[in-house]
């Protein structure tokens, strides 16, 4: 984190005489996703990476998440996608769209670097249970074809959508799978308008719409 940026919440809190919570953990908003009913999902690739909180065990990190977010149940998948400089933010791989339902990205090309990583995540999701012992309903979302910038693979993913009150803003990539991804998401969010917006010139910054919202 940038030290001067990190001071801003404390200054605002002091100015308005409101409490400020210091969680004591290094993490980013894109590393967690919620079902709105007490369950959080994250990835070991990100939150257990030694470049963040090497002094904390998995159980200690879970306790921080429970205390900070007020959740009761935490689910872990292992992998992120290739090209993600955050080590594996969950907002590129797995997203809740209902209390018991997730969208997970899948790579169908067996030669692609993401194939085995995302297949592993899918297997883990299939074995997970919610607190009431229900299995997750899993909807598979395709990955776009690889996108490169200066020979660097970019973390292009349709899962990096942003949910607003009335809309779901979905990154598209001038790719043959764009419409398929939009159609899947329309089925997942029937009460919202699903809008695809070209993210090709945004993704070179290593994130898309959900990343921008965080």
Where are these regions (language model features)?
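The feature marks the mature, well-folded catalytic cores of soluble enzymes
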Residues: 1-214
């Amino acid at each position: 984190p940038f030290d001067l940026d990190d001071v801003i919440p404390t200054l605002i809190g002091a100015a308005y005489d409101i409490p400020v919570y210091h969680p004591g953990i290094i993490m980013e908003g894109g590393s967690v996703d919620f079902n709105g009913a007490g369950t959080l999902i994250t990835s070991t690739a990100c939150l257990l990476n030694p470049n963040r909180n090497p002094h904390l065990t998995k159980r200690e990190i879970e306790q921080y998440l429970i205390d900070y977010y007020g959740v009761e149940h935490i689910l872990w998948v292992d992998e992120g996608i290739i090209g993600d400089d955050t080590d594996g933010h969950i907002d590129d791989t797995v997203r809740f769209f209902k209390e018991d339902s997730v969208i997970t990205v899948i790579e169908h090309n067996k030669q692609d670097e993401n194939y085995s990583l995302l297949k592993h995540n899918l297997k883990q999701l299939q074995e997970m249970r919610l607190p009431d012992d229900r299995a997750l309903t899993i909807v598979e979302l395709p990955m776009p074809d690889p996108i490169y910038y200066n020979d660097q693979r970019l973390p292009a993913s349709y899962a990096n959508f942003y949910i607003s009150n009335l809309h779901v803003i979905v990154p598209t990539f001038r790719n043959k799978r764009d419409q398929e991804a939009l159609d899947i998401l329309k089925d997942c969010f029937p009460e919202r308008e699903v809008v695809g917006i070209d993210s090709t010139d945004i993704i070179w910054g290593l994130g898309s719409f959900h990343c921008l919202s965080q």
